[in-house]
Amino acid sequence: MLFWHTQPEHYNQHNSGSYLRDVLALPIFKQEEPQLSPENEARLPPLQYVLCAATSPAVKLHEETLTYLNQGQSYEIRLLENRKLGDFQDLNTKYVKSIIRVVFHDRRLQYTEHQQLEGWRWSRPGDRILDIDIPLSVGILDPRASPTQLNAVEFLWDPAKRASAFIQVHCISTEFTPRKHGGEKGVPFRVQIDTFKQNENGEYTEHLHSASCQIKVFKPKGADRKQKTDREKMEKRTAQEKEKYQPSYETTILTECSPWPDVAYQVNSAPSPSYNGSPNSFGLGEGNASPTHPVEALPVGSDHLLPSASIQDAQQWLHRNRFSQFCRLFASFSGADLLKMSRDDLVQICGPADGIRLFNAIKGRNVRPKMTIYVCQELEQNRVPLQQKRDGSGDSNLSVYHAIFLEELTTLELIEKIANLYSISPQHIHRVYRQGPTGIHVVVSNEMVQNFQDESCFVLSTIKAESNDGYHIILKCGL
C-alpha cells in the first residue's frame, strides 16, 4: 500500500487555491502576492508536481531550492492538478502523458549532453540513468523506458485521480566531474517533467505543462549525511545569518519552466493490453509505405564516407556522425584523405576513444546484432496462390521476408523495428502476440524476445484494436 507523506490537507485536488497560496508563501516566491485573486487563480498552471524529498537548508533566499537524493533509492513524485475539474473540459482525452527526465543543470554540460551521456553509457553498459519503480507507483498507465533514452521515462495518467510516480536515479553527481585529486564537488542535475495532451490525431504532442527542480545525487546514504551536515552548519550560524537562508521543507515543489526540446518518442495511446478484435484484412502499411513500396529515404547519420567526397562533404559527414570537435582539425581533408588514414594515425590525432570510433565509422564497420529475425506480412505471403508457389520457378512466386536486427532484445525495440519496417508510427502497434499451441495468443514479453531463436522466421498477422486506432500484431511461425 502506498504511504503518503504527512502533508496538509491542501494537497486535496478540490482545495487547490489554498495549496497554491502555501506554495507561493515560500521564500523564493516572497516577491509574489500571497493572496490569489480570482483573475490570478484563473491563470494558475493546470498541474503541479511535488518531489517527496527534503530541500537543503543551505540555500539562500531567492535562490532555487536544492534537493539531495540517494543513488538508486525510490522517490515519490506526486502529480497534482491545481484547478477544478471543470477547467479540464478542454482536454479531448481522459489521460495526459508525462515525460520525466534527469538533465544537466549547468549550461556548459547541456551543450555536451549527448557526449556526456554516451560516455556514461560506455562506462556503465546495461545500466540506466533514470528508472521508474512500477510496483510503488500509483495511478499511472503504460510506463515506458526507451532503450535509446537512458535519462527519461514516460507514462499516462488521469489528472482527475491521484497519481504518483516513484523514480530512481542511478548516476551520481560526481560521475560528470573531471577527476583530479578526489573529493570534487558534484555537478547538479535537474528533474524535469513535461506533460502533453492529445492532438486531433490522438497523439500526445500538444504541450500542456512543464516544471523542474534542482537536485544532486549521492552514493547510497550520502544524501542523508549531506543533509545532516548542512543542518548542523546552519545551527551554528547566528540568528541574523539564518535569516538569509531558506528553511528546509519536507517536500520539493517543481517550478514552471520551458518544455524540453527533444520529444523523440510518442507513447502508446491505448492503455489497456486487452483486445477483442477479430482477424481482418487491414495491412500494416495501410495509408503508409510498405517494404514493397518504400518511400524515399532521408539521408541518415550512419552513411558511409566515399573516396569521391569533397572537403565540404567530408566536413558534413563528420558533423552527421558526431565528430564535430575534429572538423577544424580535418578542415582540409577530403574523403579520400580520411580513408587513407590508419587506425594508429587516428588514435594518435584524436585520442584512443574517439580515434577508434572515427576509424570504425570511416571504414563502415557495423556491430553484429545480437539477434536477427525474418518477418513477412501475411498479405504478402498469400498474394500468390499456393499452387503457383509449388509449380512456379520465378522470383514472383516467392514469399519475401525482411530482416529485423535486434540489439536490446526488448518488446519495445521489436515494436519500433516492425513499425519502422512498414513506415508506420510505433503508437499504432498496441500489442504483439505470438501464436502458440492450438492457436492461442501469448503476449510477447521481453523474456520471450530474449529467447527467440536466432534467424527465426515469422509471418505477421494483424488484428484491429478495440479502439479502432491501431493494431495488434500476431507472430506466426514462418516457412
From Swiss-Prot:
Residues 43-280 form the Grh/CP2 DB domain. Residues 261-365 are annotated as: SAM2-like domain. Residues 219-245, 271-301 are annotated as: Disordered. Coiled coil: none annotated. SUPFAM superfamilies: SAM/Pointed domain (SSF47769). Residues 221-245 have a biased composition (Basic and acidic residues). GO terms for molecular function: DNA-binding transcription activator activity, RNA polymerase II-specific; DNA-binding transcription factor activity, RNA polymerase II-specific; RNA polymerase II cis-regulatory region sequence-specific DNA binding; sequence-specific double-stranded DNA binding. Highly expressed in placental JEG-3 cells and very low levels of expression in non-steroidogenic cells. No expression was seen in adrenal NCI-H295A cells or in adrenal tissue. It is found in: Nucleus. Its main location: nucleus. GO terms for biological process: cell morphogenesis; cytoplasm organization; determination of adult lifespan; epithelial cell maturation; negative regulation of transcription by RNA polymerase II; positive regulation of growth; regulation of transcription by RNA polymerase II; salivary gland development. Gene3D superfamilies: Transcription Factor, Ets-1. Forms homohexamers via its SAM-like domain. Interacts with MTA1; which is indispensable for TFCP2l1-mediated self-renewal-promoting effect and endoderm-inhibiting action. PANTHER family: TRANSCRIPTION FACTOR CP2 (PTHR11037), TRANSCRIPTION FACTOR CP2-LIKE PROTEIN 1 (PTHR11037:SF18). Transcription factor that facilitates establishment and maintenance of pluripotency in embryonic stem cells (ESCs). With KLF2, acts as the major effector of self-renewal that mediates induction of pluripotency downstream of LIF/STAT3 and Wnt/beta-catenin signaling. Required for normal duct development in the salivary gland and kidney. Coordinates the development of the kidney collecting ducts intercalated (IC) and principal (PC) cells, which regulate acid-base and salt-water homeostasis, respectively. Belongs to the grh/CP2 family. CP2 subfamily. This is Transcription factor CP2-like protein 1. It comes from Homo sapiens. The lineage of its organism: Eukaryota, Metazoa, Chordata, Craniata, Vertebrata.
